[in-house]
Amino acid sequence: MILLVRFAPAADAELLAVIARIGADSPSAAVAFRDKALHALSRLRDFPDSGRTLPEYPALPVREVIAAPYRFFYQVKVDAVWIVAVWQGAQLADPPEDWVSRKR
Protein backbone atom coordinates (compact mmCIF):
# COMPACT_ATOMS: atom_id res chain seq x y z
CA MET A 1 0.00 0.00 0.00
CA ILE A 2 1.29 3.46 -0.88
CA LEU A 3 0.79 5.99 1.91
CA LEU A 4 0.86 9.76 1.80
CA VAL A 5 3.71 11.47 3.62
CA ARG A 6 2.29 14.44 5.51
CA PHE A 7 3.65 16.97 7.96
CA ALA A 8 2.00 17.80 11.27
CA PRO A 9 1.75 21.61 11.48
CA ALA A 10 4.49 21.83 14.13
CA ALA A 11 6.88 19.71 12.05
CA ASP A 12 6.08 21.74 8.94
CA ALA A 13 6.96 24.93 10.85
CA GLU A 14 10.19 23.33 12.08
CA LEU A 15 11.19 22.35 8.54
CA LEU A 16 10.40 25.81 7.18
CA ALA A 17 12.50 27.37 9.95
CA VAL A 18 15.43 25.10 9.08
CA ILE A 19 15.17 26.02 5.39
CA ALA A 20 14.98 29.71 6.29
CA ARG A 21 18.11 29.46 8.49
CA ILE A 22 20.05 27.70 5.77
CA GLY A 23 18.71 30.11 3.15
CA ALA A 24 19.89 33.14 5.10
CA ASP A 25 23.47 32.05 4.33
CA SER A 26 22.94 30.28 1.03
CA PRO A 27 19.66 30.12 -0.88
CA SER A 28 21.01 27.36 -3.13
CA ALA A 29 22.01 25.28 -0.10
CA ALA A 30 18.50 25.70 1.30
CA VAL A 31 16.97 24.40 -1.93
CA ALA A 32 19.45 21.51 -2.01
CA PHE A 33 18.64 20.57 1.59
CA ARG A 34 14.89 20.76 0.96
CA ASP A 35 15.26 18.48 -2.05
CA LYS A 36 17.49 16.05 -0.12
CA ALA A 37 15.05 15.91 2.79
CA LEU A 38 11.98 15.38 0.62
CA HIS A 39 13.79 12.68 -1.36
CA ALA A 40 14.80 10.87 1.85
CA LEU A 41 11.22 11.06 3.15
CA SER A 42 9.68 9.90 -0.14
CA ARG A 43 10.73 6.29 0.50
CA LEU A 44 8.25 6.22 3.37
CA ARG A 45 5.38 6.14 0.86
CA ASP A 46 6.31 2.59 -0.10
CA PHE A 47 8.30 1.52 2.95
CA PRO A 48 6.78 3.25 5.98
CA ASP A 49 8.68 1.11 8.48
CA SER A 50 12.07 1.67 6.85
CA GLY A 51 13.16 4.36 9.30
CA ARG A 52 14.91 3.32 12.46
CA THR A 53 13.46 3.42 15.94
CA LEU A 54 14.87 6.20 18.08
CA PRO A 55 17.97 4.95 19.90
CA GLU A 56 17.31 7.41 22.73
CA TYR A 57 13.65 6.47 23.15
CA PRO A 58 13.04 2.98 21.75
CA ALA A 59 9.67 2.66 23.51
CA LEU A 60 8.14 5.61 21.64
CA PRO A 61 5.98 4.69 18.63
CA VAL A 62 8.10 7.02 16.51
CA ARG A 63 10.73 6.30 13.87
CA GLU A 64 13.24 8.55 12.16
CA VAL A 65 14.73 9.29 8.77
CA ILE A 66 17.96 11.23 8.61
CA ALA A 67 18.68 13.90 6.02
CA ALA A 68 21.97 15.03 7.51
CA PRO A 69 22.35 16.96 9.65
CA TYR A 70 18.62 16.80 10.49
CA ARG A 71 16.46 14.04 11.90
CA PHE A 72 12.85 13.69 10.78
CA PHE A 73 10.68 11.91 13.32
CA TYR A 74 7.52 10.21 12.10
CA GLN A 75 4.61 7.96 12.97
CA VAL A 76 2.84 5.54 10.68
CA LYS A 77 -0.93 5.92 10.83
CA VAL A 78 -3.65 4.13 8.88
CA ASP A 79 -4.07 6.92 6.34
CA ALA A 80 -0.55 8.37 6.09
CA VAL A 81 2.96 8.66 7.41
CA TRP A 82 3.01 11.75 9.63
CA ILE A 83 6.22 13.70 10.13
CA VAL A 84 5.85 14.92 13.72
CA ALA A 85 9.16 16.68 14.44
CA VAL A 86 12.39 17.89 12.86
CA TRP A 87 15.55 18.13 14.97
CA GLN A 88 19.12 19.10 14.22
CA GLY A 89 21.20 15.95 14.62
CA ALA A 90 23.28 17.29 17.52
CA GLN A 91 20.17 18.23 19.51
CA LEU A 92 19.84 16.24 22.70
CA ALA A 93 16.69 16.84 24.65
CA ASP A 94 13.86 15.10 26.36
CA PRO A 95 11.23 13.98 23.86
CA PRO A 96 8.38 16.44 23.51
CA GLU A 97 5.35 15.03 25.30
CA ASP A 98 3.18 15.91 22.33
CA TRP A 99 5.11 13.94 19.67
CA VAL A 100 2.76 11.01 19.91
CA SER A 101 -0.32 13.21 19.88
CA ARG A 102 0.60 15.92 17.35
CA LYS A 103 -2.46 16.41 15.21
CA ARG A 104 -2.57 16.88 11.50
Where are the model-predicted features located?
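Enriched for short, Lys/Arg-rich terminal
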Residues: A67-R71, Q75-R104
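Short, hydrophobic secondary-structure boundary micro-motifs
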Residues: V31-A32, R52-E56, P95
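Arg/Lys-rich, positively charged N-terminal/basic patches that mediate binding to nucleic acids
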Residues: M1-K36
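A general secondary-structure boundary signal
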Residues: L15-I19, L60, E64-I66, A80-W82
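A short, surface-exposed loop/turn module that caps and links secondary-structure elements
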Residues: H39-A67
